Amino acid sequence: MTTIAIVDYGVGNLRSVAQALRAAAPEADVRVVDAPEGIRSADRVVLPGQGAMPDCMSALGASGLQEAVIEAAASKPMFGVCVGEQMLFESSSEARPGTDKTPCLGLMPGEVIRFELDGMTQPDGSRYKVPQMGWNRVKQSRPHPLWDGIPDESWFYFVHSYFVRAQDPAHIAGETEYGVVFTSAVARDNIFATQFHPEKSAAMGLQLYRNFVHWNP
C-alpha cells in the first residue's frame, strides 16, 4: 500500500487535503505527520501551506521537519500546494517588516512575487482584486503525467496574492491569466506543485491527486 505523508507544521487546512487524497485514492494510506520519521517512512509527500510566507517558513523550521522535507524532495514524489508550492523556490518578496525577502527551501530556482494590479480592469470593467479568489483556467504548458485525464484549460480554485516566477522555463507546467500571465503549476523530476488548491477544485482536483498517487517519476 502506498503511504502518503501530509506535512503538518502547524499551518494550513490539512483536513481538506487529507479528505481529497483519500477520496481520490482510497487504496492509499494517507497520514498527516508532524515528525521527521513520518516523512522519511512515507512513499510520497504532500507539502501544503497557506497564510504568510514568513510564518510558514518559520513554522516549518521550528517544527523540525524542514530537513526531512528537503531529503524527501531529493527522491520521493512530492506535491506542493499553494504556499507549499512557493516554499519550494529560493525566496519570496513576502517578508517581515525591515527585510526585503524571506528565504525559502531553494529546491527550485526562482522567486515568489506579488500581484501588481493596481488600476487594472478586467474585461467586464471591474477592477482586479488581490488576492485572487475563485475559479480560473490553467493552460498546460507541457505534457506531464499529472495532467493525464485533465483537459487543457480546465478550471481550478485559487486563493493567493503571490505567485512563483520560475527561473527555468522548463519547470513551468501550467500558466494562468489574472491581469498578467503567471505560473500556476511547476514540475521538476520527482516534484510537482500548484498555486491552486486541488482539494477545492472538484473533479479535476481529485484527478490531479489521483495521478500523483500513481505517478512513478
Swiss-Prot record:
<comment type="subunit">
    <text>Heterodimer of HisH and HisF.</text>
</comment>
<keyword id="KW-0368">Histidine biosynthesis</keyword>
<keyword id="KW-0456">Lyase</keyword>
<feature type="domain" description="Glutamine amidotransferase type-1">
    <location>
        <begin position="3"/>
        <end position="217"/>
    </location>
</feature>
<dbReference type="GO" id="GO:0000105">
    <property type="term" value="P:L-histidine biosynthetic process"/>
</dbReference>
<dbReference type="GO" id="GO:0016829">
    <property type="term" value="F:lyase activity"/>
</dbReference>
<comment type="function">
    <text>IGPS catalyzes the conversion of PRFAR and glutamine to IGP, AICAR and glutamate. The HisH subunit catalyzes the hydrolysis of glutamine to glutamate and ammonia as part of the synthesis of IGP and AICAR. The resulting ammonia molecule is channeled to the active site of HisF.</text>
</comment>
<keyword id="KW-0315">Glutamine amidotransferase</keyword>
<dbReference type="InterPro" id="IPR029062">
    <property type="entry name" value="Class_I_gatase-like"/>
</dbReference>
<feature type="active site">
    <location>
        <position position="197"/>
    </location>
</feature>
<dbReference type="Pfam" id="PF00117">
    <property type="entry name" value="GATase"/>
</dbReference>
<feature type="active site" description="Nucleophile">
    <location>
        <position position="82"/>
    </location>
</feature>
<keyword id="KW-0378">Hydrolase</keyword>
<feature type="active site">
    <location>
        <position position="199"/>
    </location>
</feature>
<dbReference type="GO" id="GO:0005737">
    <property type="term" value="C:cytoplasm"/>
</dbReference>
<dbReference type="InterPro" id="IPR017926">
    <property type="entry name" value="GATASE"/>
</dbReference>
<dbReference type="GO" id="GO:0000107">
    <property type="term" value="F:imidazoleglycerol-phosphate synthase activity"/>
</dbReference>
<keyword id="KW-0028">Amino-acid biosynthesis</keyword>
<keyword id="KW-0963">Cytoplasm</keyword>
<dbReference type="InterPro" id="IPR010139">
    <property type="entry name" value="Imidazole-glycPsynth_HisH"/>
</dbReference>
<dbReference type="GO" id="GO:0004359">
    <property type="term" value="F:glutaminase activity"/>
</dbReference>
<comment type="pathway">
    <text>Amino-acid biosynthesis; L-histidine biosynthesis; L-histidine from 5-phospho-alpha-D-ribose 1-diphosphate: step 5/9.</text>
</comment>
<protein>
    <recommendedName>
        <fullName>Imidazole glycerol phosphate synthase subunit HisH</fullName>
        <ecNumber>4.3.2.10</ecNumber>
        <ecNumber>3.5.1.2</ecNumber>
    </recommendedName>
</protein>
